[in-house]
């Protein structure tokens, strides 16, 4: 017996569910709000965006690194009586994973409409990118035993090994990958919500101080305080909501290695989970990379965007440096990426603001940074 998934099975849920509401607080550095307040405000904003009352939401999901609030508290603040909730310890891909879980629990009849949130004081309190958080102190277990003894305490330190390996194997250069920051800064300059709106150059990136080779300061995301939320429901309910629903065509979860300590296990270390997930993702969605007009990537670092776009099949393995430096991902290019500025410029939300941005793109709500085709019309 194996664990292979039949990507063409009739059980897939293509087009049966949609994101109907999105909400967020400001992306700031320094707030007088705790994460409970941020989450409550974000979920309320998403409900208002969808045109839903507290009586019409009955499920709630969230993720954190033990740095946030819980669903029952937020639901209580909003007067929501929950039929289902779950709070998970998650990472950068948890938004998409929880979208899949929301679809599953609705399909199972456990609830009807699910709010998903991430709230974090990622600058003023728990800074994921630093080395002084609670997770860096003893006692350690699991993957932490492999890395912490050698000084691998931050995400940048751990990811840098993958980036260096890609440079070694394929000749990728920091100059090429710096274009990710350049392009995302161009997009953020159009976005009034972005924390960093200033455009930068490749020289700006490479002359910023070194954090851990090959990452310079401007290769790294912008730590911010924020709350963000989305709402998922069935497509038939979605049509009664305030905006055109953003239909969900496919959701896939896949780990690249059995354990989180990616660099201490067999197999390539410069390949991300998208390499393994794409053969399920695309058939389930009924489209391929060539059909996509705009993308959203988890840009915790410039290099992570490059690896994701490569491993999801937008270019061949080893050609990611050429792809991101070609201009294809900027507004006016063939396939704009992170049109709000992403984590590198709009603000770090642990993965959810790219989903919010793409929902707005699909609805045509983003006049200042919406991809525009040669004929002047929006293309989605």
Can you describe what each PLM-predicted range is?
Residues 267-302, 311-314, 343-347:
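Extended C-terminal subregions enriched in glycine
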Residues 2-93, 101, 105, 162, ...:
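Conserved active-site "lid/cap" helical segment
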Residues 66-77, 260-265, 299-322:
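Short glycine/threonine-rich loop-to-helix capping motif typified by GTGT followed
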Residues 2-35, 179, 210-276, 280, ...:
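Condensing-enzyme catalytic core mediating Claisen C-C bond formation in acyl metabolism
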Residues 90-120, 156-190, 230-236, 345-366:
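Active-site-proximal alpha-helical scaffold in enzymes
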């Amino acid at each position: 017996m194996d664990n292979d998934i039949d990507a063409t099975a009739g059980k897939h849920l293509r087009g049966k569910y949609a994101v109907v509401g999105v909400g967020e607080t400001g992306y700031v550095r320094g707030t007088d709000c705790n994460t409970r307040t941020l989450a409550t405000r974000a979920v309320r904003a998403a409900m208002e965006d969808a045109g839903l009352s507290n009586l019409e939401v009955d499920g709630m999901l969230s993720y954190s690194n033990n740095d946030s609030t819980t669903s029952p508290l937020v639901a209580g603040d909003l007067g929501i009586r929950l039929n289902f909730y779950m709070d998970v310890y998650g990472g950068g891909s948890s938004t998409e994973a929880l979208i899949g879980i929301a679809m599953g629990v609705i399909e199972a009849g456990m609830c009807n409409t699910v709010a998903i949130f991430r709230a974090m004081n990622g600058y003023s309190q728990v800074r994921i990118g630093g080395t002084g958080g609670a997770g860096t102190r003893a006692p350690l277990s699991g993957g932490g035993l492999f890395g912490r003894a050698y000084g691998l305490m931050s995400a940048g330190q751990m990811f840098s090994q993958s980036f260096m390996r890609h440079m070694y194997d394929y000749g990728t250069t920091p100059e090429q990958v710096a274009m990710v920051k350049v392009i995302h800064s161009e997009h953020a300059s159009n976005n009034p919500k972005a924390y960093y709106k200033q455009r930068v150059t490749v020289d700006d990136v490479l002359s910023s101080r070194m954090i851990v080779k090959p990452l310079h300061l401007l290769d790294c995301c912008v730590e911010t305080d924020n709350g963000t939320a989305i709402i998922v429901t069935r497509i038939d309910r979605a049509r009664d909501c305030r905006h055109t629903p953003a239909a969900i065509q496919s959701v896939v979860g896949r780990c690249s290695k059995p354990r989180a300590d990616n660099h201490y296990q067999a197999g390539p270390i410069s390949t991300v989970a998208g390499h393994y997930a794409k053969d399920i993702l695309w058939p389930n969605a009924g489209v391929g990379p060539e059909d996509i007009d705009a993308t959203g990537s988890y840009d915790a670092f410039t290099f992570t965007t490059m690896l994701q776009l490569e491993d999801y099949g937008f270019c061949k393995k080893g050609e990611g440096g050429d792809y991101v430096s070609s201009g294809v991902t900027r507004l006016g290019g063939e396939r704009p990426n992170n049109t709000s500025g992403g984590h590198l410029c709009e603000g770090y939300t642990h993965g959810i603001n790219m989903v919010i941005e793409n929902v707005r793109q699909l609805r045509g709500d983003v006049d200042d940074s919406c991809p525009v085709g040669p004929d002047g019309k929006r293309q989605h």
